[in-house]
Amino acid sequence: MKVAVLGSGQWGSTLAQVLIDAGNEVIIWGRNKEVIDEINAKHSNSSALFEHLLPAALSATRDIERALDGAELIVLAIPSQSLRENLLRWKGLISSDIAIVSTLKGIEISTQLRMSEVISQVLGRDSSMISVLTLSLIHI
């Protein structure tokens, strides 16, 4: 399956590795040129994962059209408060048959909507059809 991971931070990079390890073709999108260049050239993301090496099969791009081209699954791993702004820019590129998994936590400050509700509102999808993946670590 071709997967577009949108967000090249710690969570996006980690999920990209897990998805490649599961046998998927993965491309990661990010805004930071230095991070994208490092992922492509050195298979690392030192700003997020320190010395951890990423799979050689992982490619990265700053071009959202390239990232979404042919994607069967989109994994959202961008900052929560930038979700609406990004989706408004991208919505013409995201067809209704592409599955979406949101890893975003919290609520949109300006509307008090959950991230799945923002996705539903902007993309015109039933919020029950949006998968939400979260992970919280508890230290006792």
Predicted segment positions?
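Calmodulin-binding IQ motif helices
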Residues: 140
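NAD(P)+-binding Rossmann beta1-loop-alpha1 motif at the extreme N-terminus of oxidoreductases
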Residues: 1-51, 59-62, 89
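N-terminal Rossmann-like dinucleotide/flavin-binding domain of flavoprotein oxidoreductases
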Residues: 54-57, 66
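Conserved short-loop catalytic and cofactor-binding motifs
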Residues: 27, 55, 103, 107
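Rossmann-like NAD(P)(H) cofactor-binding subdomain of soluble oxidoreductases
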Residues: 61-64, 69, 73-137
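Short, well-ordered coil/turn elements that cap or connect secondary structure elements
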Residues: 21-23, 53-55, 95, 124-127
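Short, flexible loop segments at the rims of nucleotide/cofactor-binding pockets, characterized by
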Residues: 51-55, 78-79
